[in-house]
Amino acid sequence: MNSIWARLRLASSQLPIGGYSYSQGLEAALDNGWVRDAESARTWLVDQLQLNLARFEAPLLAGLLRAALIGDWAACDAASERHRASRETRELAQESRQMGFSLHQLLEALPELDAPGRAWLARQDPPNLAAAWAMAARAWRLDAEEALSAWFWSWLENQLAVLMKTLPLGQLAAQKLASSLLPELDRACAEALRRPAVEGSAAFGLALASMTHETQYSRLFRS
């Protein structure tokens, strides 16, 4: 089967894992005035890509994806635990748990994931999103680059949806922003595949946005 179908499926906004309930700190950045228009939104997103996702989140996920594809369960355990420990706020931890749980439930209901993958995922109590994403890649026969590019696209599409609802950003403006960000997305994905996973990150702006969001007076999103 052509792997493009599985990649589109994994990246799709129709994947029922609740991703569009979360803004990953962007709603708080808007409320605090750090993001005010399309230009400042682009700066925020490029910083996230270059300073956080490409250097920490995505290399960690790439390692987990590679381990999952070959069935190196000890390496999967280590990467999953590192991902769990790296969530800097309660909101971000709950987001990863809820989305991981929902993706686990989906994989349990579908036939593609093999017995070793199901057994490992069942031992994660509950699985975080990175763990479940890696098992989805195993189930749907995606290599690390394919599954990671789906993850990056899902992230970007989510952030654009947040901007359209809260800035607000029009659909055409959102597509123009997407066009300007696609080269950055490509570079971030390539860098993440080259980098080894590291022990931790220091995304202070994201952590502060997430913490202030927990006490924000009015909000649309859960993070």
Curated annotation (Swiss-Prot):
Cellular location(s): Cytoplasm
Gene Ontology, cellular component aspect: cytoplasm
Sorted UniProt keywords: Chaperone, Cytoplasm, Nickel insertion
UniProt-recorded Gene Ontology molecular function terms: nickel cation binding
Pfam annotation, one family: UreF
Subunit field text: UreD, UreF and UreG form a complex that acts as a GTP-hydrolysis-dependent molecular chaperone, activating the urease apoprotein by helping to assemble the nickel containing metallocenter of UreC. The UreE protein probably delivers the nickel.
Function: Required for maturation of urease via the functional incorporation of the urease nickel metallocenter.
PANTHER family: UREASE ACCESSORY PROTEIN F (PTHR33620:SF1)
Family: Belongs to the UreF family.
Protein name: Urease accessory protein UreF
Species of the source: Pseudomonas aeruginosa (strain ATCC 15692 / DSM 22644 / CIP 104116 / JCM 14847 / LMG 12228 / 1C / PRS 101 / PAO1)
Organism lineage string: Bacteria, Pseudomonadati, Pseudomonadota, Gammaproteobacteria, Pseudomonadales
